[in-house]
């Protein structure tokens, strides 16, 4: 059988909210009770054909800060539920675990489904921004789905959302707005903060410059930067140092 996973930051949330939905779907499909079983000790569903659906607890562990425990798994496909709760490293390691269990045997492409409300974690940069700009890679897909699109939701639930939610939360959860915290009075635009780590918008400049914060014998470091236009390409620092040492370093740059 094939191997699938359903991942969430807290396993308890999967038990409380996702397992009842799985039972509902199995019943809608008309599968008899003996066609599957749930192993509550190891947290997986096993189907009549041997395929398994593992429920994964993806909370942060100080002993595994980069979530490497997921990278060694062998999965056919997977699903990240509430992707807005996930860090990039957990998403990345879950992603590399798919396509490794009987995909070739059953001619199945490795696929990862992520469901989430609008958030400003890796989803914003990896999916929403490229989708909006028309640059999303062909092997990825972004599907914007609003509560109004779900025909299974009771009308009273939608009405309750409309009455209860306010401000940014209403824009985010009801109308699917990803730029929900863009404030025109904010000191820095959120997209500009993200761009700090890439600076793709800065034109290439052939002129180079040097800046130096000379600390000498103070408690601060002496910091020297080499710039190509507005791009900082080198950083050098010195502990307590004489002017001759600083001059010597500058002459080598």
Where in the sequence are the language-model features?
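Nucleic-acid-processing active sites and adjacent nucleic-acid-binding tracks
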Residues: 225-253
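Inter-Walker segment of RecA-like/P-loop motor cores
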Residues: 15-76
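ATPase catalytic-site recognition across NTP-hydrolyzing enzymes
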Residues: 150-212, 226
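Walker B catalytic acidic pair
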Residues: 81-82
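Conserved RecA-like ASCE P-loop NTPase motor core of nucleic-acid helicases/translocases
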Residues: 2-14
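Residues immediately C-terminal
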Residues: 13, 85, 217
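Short, flexible loop/turn motifs enriched in small residues
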Residues: 205, 216-223
